[in-house]
UniProtKB/Swiss-Prot annotation:
Disease as annotated in the protein's UniProt record: 3-methylglutaconic aciduria 1: An inborn error of leucine metabolism. It leads to an autosomal recessive syndrome with variable clinical phenotype, ranging from delayed speech development to severe psychomotor retardation, coma, failure to thrive, metabolic acidosis and dystonia.
Protein name per its UniProtKB record: Methylglutaconyl-CoA hydratase, mitochondrial
Transit peptide: 1-67
Localization in the cell: Mitochondrion
Length: 339
């Protein structure tokens, strides 16, 4: 089968070396021995949060993004491993209230550290990214911090942001962005890196970088077209338009839209419900399904089917597959161990 996969057609363009190494490592961890078509070796695993008073999309200006990088930096990212019936679900809670959860150097460092730990933890089944600050998911870059950077510092820092967002996109388990508030610029790019996005109807989302005479630098120019189509993505980026939750659902940017509740966490609760739906499924199957979808979306159908075949082969020798068959025969819930 490996020979058949290697022979599958579908030439691809070159990819940034760092991204290629990242995906190669991810693929090796998910599917040891998996051989993708030669032109796909190291291919990027493609993808594929509420605020009141913000101006809606119809002709209105983008919300202002004034915030500070001052005050304390500890506890800006809270990593919670849920227990009991939610065991296996990890929640990354962004908690930088004084900076509207903007992407500072410290927050990027903390995100990178958390993602590095999670990607190799086989007890993790699903990851939810949310805000612990009412009304905000992530307001994008910390502009006050950015204003203090020299021109020579900006590029490398944006590259760090892009790398962390790519790491999130390449996590081996399902990821869900719970958008209960404002998600602008890098905040929306962070959400776009997740497998599934859910939002409150009052949430505001947009790639507004062109208002600052720059472009999205955290993957937005690539992931937004893949999510909603090229023409509409161009329109939204060119206009710096901001969408509310219902508008985002209508264009396919998010999967679910909820009316906000009194607690302000409607999207998070929906994300938690989805994560609970994922928990009973076979862990190995979930990982290789994500890999097959992500890799297959980047290539032609014939090559994608070869990728699916190679990924399916990884599930055949697993103990979980045998457990699934036995549980079906015995008419009981399966007890999967990720083996």
């Amino acid at each position: 089968m490996a020979a058949a996969v290697a022979a599958a057609p579908g030439a691809l363009g070159s990819l940034h070396a760092g991204g290629a190494r990242l995906v190669a490592a991810c693929s090796a961890w998910l599917c040891p021995g998996l051989r993708l078509p030669g032109s796909l070796a190291g291919r990027r695993a493609g993808p594929a949060i509420w605020a009141q008073g913000w101006v809606p999309a119809a002709g209105g200006p983008a919300p202002k993004r004034g915030y500070s990088s001052e005050m304390k930096t500890e506890d800006e990212l809270r990593v919670r491993h849920l227990e009991e019936e939610n065991r296996g679900i990890v929640v990354l809670g962004i908690n930088r209230a004084y900076g509207k959860n903007s992407l500072s150097k410290n927050l990027i460092k903390m995100l990178s550290k958390a993602v590095d730990a999670l990607k190799s933890d086989k007890k993790v089944r699903t990851i939810i990214i949310r805000s612990e600050v009412p009304g905000i998911f992530c307001a994008g870059a910390d502009l006050k911090e950015r204003a203090k950077m020299s021109s020579s510092e900006v590029g490398p820092f944006v590259s760090k942001i892009r790398a962390v967002i790519n790491d999130i996109a390449n996590l081996p388990v399902p990821t869900i962005a719970a958008i209960d508030g404002l998600a602008l610029g890098g905040g929306l790019e962070l959400a776009l890196a997740c497998d599934i996005r859910v939002a409150a109807s009052s949430a505001k989302m947009g790639l507004v970088e062109t208002k600052l005479a720059i472009i999205p630098g955290g993957g937005g120019t690539q992931r937004l077209p893949r999510a909603i189509g090229m023409s509409l993505a161009k329109e939204l980026i060119f206009s710096a338009r901001v969408l509310d939750g219902k508008e985002a659902k209508a264009v396919g940017l998010i999967s679910h839209v909820l009316e906000q509740n009194q607690e302000g966490d409607a999207a998070y609760r929906k994300a938690l419900d989805l994560a609970r739906e994922f928990l009973p499924q076979g862990p190995v199957a979930m990982r290789v399904a994500k890999l097959a979808i992500n890799q297959g979306m980047e290539v032609d159908l014939v090559t994608g089917l070869a990728i699916e075949e190679a990924c399916y082969a990884q599930t055949i020798p697993t103990k979980d597959r045998l457990e699934g068959l036995l549980a079906f025969k015995e008419k009981r819930p399966p007890r999967y161990k990720g083996e």
